């Protein structure tokens, strides 16, 4: 078996975790935004666990090829929220929090399986679970970085609205900083971000 075959097999083991992590993440944003009074996500059919509704084709390919990517962002109208300032933070944290919950549940299932059948830890299915756990923790850490357009930025920028000058700087240059960190992580092979190698 050559390197290409091994890499394909490894990528296939990553796929379920990627699909699960991205789907749960975006579904949670959509669900909470709808609960907070804005029906945009509901109208767009985003309150679903169907991966096809959340996966961005280019972002998904980039994730497989380069180790980083993105899903379709959940849109919401701030004017429709019941309490815009706090609701924006709820919507932002919903995605990363859902990844933490997913990782914990998968860890619990894997631990339970090991207690019942210790040899199950050495199966392909166990590898898929481990990758999924790793991916969901990675999504949580990555998305909580306080850089636009990541979820963590909404928490930080919402606070810095009181300081217009600083808010503008963070909003304007945050994306460039994030892009620079990604480039450094991928092409310079420096772990500046929690990006998983595929």
Q: Can you describe what each PLM-predicted range is?
A:
Residues 1-198:
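Hydrophobic transmembrane alpha-helices and their immediate loop junctions
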């Amino acid at each position: 078996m050559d390197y290409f075959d091994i890499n394909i097999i490894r990528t296939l083991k990553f796929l379920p975790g990627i699909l699960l992590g991205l789907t749960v993440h975006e579904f949670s944003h959509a669900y909470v935004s709808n609960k907070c009074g804005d029906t945009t996500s509901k109208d767009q059919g985003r309150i679903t666990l169907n991966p096809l509704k959340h996966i961005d084709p280019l972002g998904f390919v980039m994730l497989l090829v380069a180790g980083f990517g993105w899903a379709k962002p959940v849109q919401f109208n701030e004017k429709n929220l019941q309490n815009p300032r706090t609701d924006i933070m709820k919507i932002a944290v919903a995605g990363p929090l859902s990844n933490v919950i997913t990782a914990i549940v998968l860890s619990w299932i894997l631990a339970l399986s090991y207690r019942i059948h210790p040899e199950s830890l050495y199966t392909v299915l166990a590898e898929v679970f481990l990758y999924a756990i790793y991916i969901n923790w990675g999504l949580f850490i990555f998305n909580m970085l306080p850089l636009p357009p990541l979820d963590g930025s909404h928490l930080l920028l919402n606070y810095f609205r009181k300081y217009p000058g600083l808010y503008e700087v963070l909003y304007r240059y945050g994306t460039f900083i994030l892009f620079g960190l990604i480039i450094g992580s991928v092409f310079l092979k420096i772990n500046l971000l929690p990006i998983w190698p595929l």
